[in-house]
Amino acid sequence: MCGIVGYTGNHQAAPVLLYGLSKLEYRGYDSAGLAVRDGDGETDIIKAKGRLKVLADKTNDGESVPGTCGIGHTRWATHGEPSELNAHPHMSDDGNVVAVHNGIIENYQELKEKLIRKGYTFYSSTDTEVAVKLVDYYYKKYLGTPVDAINHAMVRIRGSYALAIMFKDYPGEIYVARKDSPMILGVEDGESYIASDVPAILKYTRNVYYIGNLEMARVRKGEITFYNLDGDEIQKEAKTIEWDAEAAEKAGFEHFMIKEIHEQPKAVKDTLNSVIREGVIDLSDVGLTDEDIRDISQIYIVACGSAYHVGMAAQYVFEDLARIPVRVELASEFRYRNPILDPKGLVIIVSQSGETADSLAALRESKEKGLRTLGIVNVVGSSIAREADNVFYTLAGPEISVATTKAYSTQLVAAYVLAIQFAKVKGTISEEKYEELIIELQTLPDKIRKIIEDDKERIQWFAAKQANARDAFFIGRGIDYAISMEGSLKMKEVSYVHTEAYAAGELKHGTISLIEDGTLVIGVLTQDHLYEKTVSNLVECKSRGAYLMGLTTFGHYNIEDTADFTVYIPKTDPHFTTSLAVVPLQLLGYYVSVAKGLDVDKPRNLAKSVTVE
């Protein structure tokens, strides 16, 4: 992994490829490369270790590389260390086949040994070079078309891949193959584009095709032909991307992360407006009927990272409002433990990209076991969106920063909407309560906006004071524990401070031994019935020298007797406090990172969309 672009048309390819790769930088990478052909000429391959600027400088921003057909790649090392040698593209021994690849080929070692016996030489430590030479082997063995050769290779590769391949015998053409790794293709005015994600080609076209699992495509100027695994042509309809290209730009903000924090009120409002019409929840676009809901006796929420924290908060809301049992599962664990599942259960898969490898695998496992599946995703046409029985689209728009903010917030309100509708249909709340909850939901965007406007500068000041913190502990009870988990992750991933989140009641069972003079402890106290208990936990920490931050609702002013710094959030229904309390914690993580001079939008070792296991 991590990012692929491709172009064939009438313009110089290299500048288009570099621009596309720049729009995929948020996915994380350690090296980059281009392969460009000028008509029937040889392929120019240029690679560079480090930032994309190194590659741009090598190629004079692409202007020194002739040719109108090419592929590009940003690599994040999975097989072989970060180096120019291991960077993509890779080519066959005679240069006939050149390719870039995202994913992991699990049986690359046995394939490599087979190819060595056939006379192939390997120069890198990557699994991608194996894929390139496997395609070349079958191309020469059967003397068929590129589609034939790729087909033979696909059935022998185990693992995940998105491949973009050029053949010397077919100038001006790019061939694409996909299994469990995202890829989109676009067409506009006699030109064609390929990319791992929409922002890379949004400047050039809004007309895109989604290539399915175990499918191939032949990409020519302004023309794309799709094939199934048997090599038969298949028909697809283009989809129109509704995103505004400017939505993927910083719009005057210093970083995407702070821009996306500010975009949360609109993202939440848009998501709510998509399913609340005239004061009533309408799930017709989701495809979930009242009859479907009555049939469901158990909910499983399966996700990774921040989406898992959404599930943790949603568990409390579903169980308390709808009185339906909920289990929250890490997708990376779910598929490997042969879980016992209620056949009348609903599996909710939460994923911003809709391509998260472990979540996608959990979805498929659930479907194989006969359970109904529902995806909460942000990307229209993504794998999870296509394969789930029902889809709840969040309307966050493009989220560029690796650390999620607005997508997380829209996932939360999607979960609230589902929980409220389940409660209504199952008769566990009154009509009056149903109406109250919907009214309160619709106040969240303005309350989020108020927090950002009122507390941003104070939190920035506090973050600057804590920039040298070695450790930070986030504690809370109930929903506040779920909020603490997300706050901890935010600070950890963007500021590189070692942070942990704990259920406050667990402090006595070992963790309190880590508290010493000056240790930063953040207490989340938004639940009135748990407030006093969490305050007592903070007092215990303070007595051991901790420096305390309290995050609570307006009215709990006695927290200032204990905490050294306090942030208040507006009152809301206790089921919805996550949506408000998470915002100061997002700002805290952001401003600590800024104070340390770090790359906020592209934290080290992280990728936006984890498309391999």
Question: Where on the chain are the PLM-derived regions?
Answer:
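Conserved short alpha-helical segments that host acidic/polar catalytic motifs at enzyme active sites
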Residues: 1-254, 266-297, 336, 431, ...
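Glycine-rich oxoanion-binding loops at beta->alpha junctions
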Residues: 68, 72-85, 275-290, 314-350, ...
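Acidic/histidine-rich
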Residues: 157-191, 467-493, 528, 535
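Active-site phosphate/pyrophosphate-binding segments
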Residues: 264-268, 272-300, 390-520, 593-613
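Glycine-rich phosphate-binding loops that contact phosphosugars or nucleotide phosphates
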Residues: 294-436, 440-443, 524-568, 588, ...
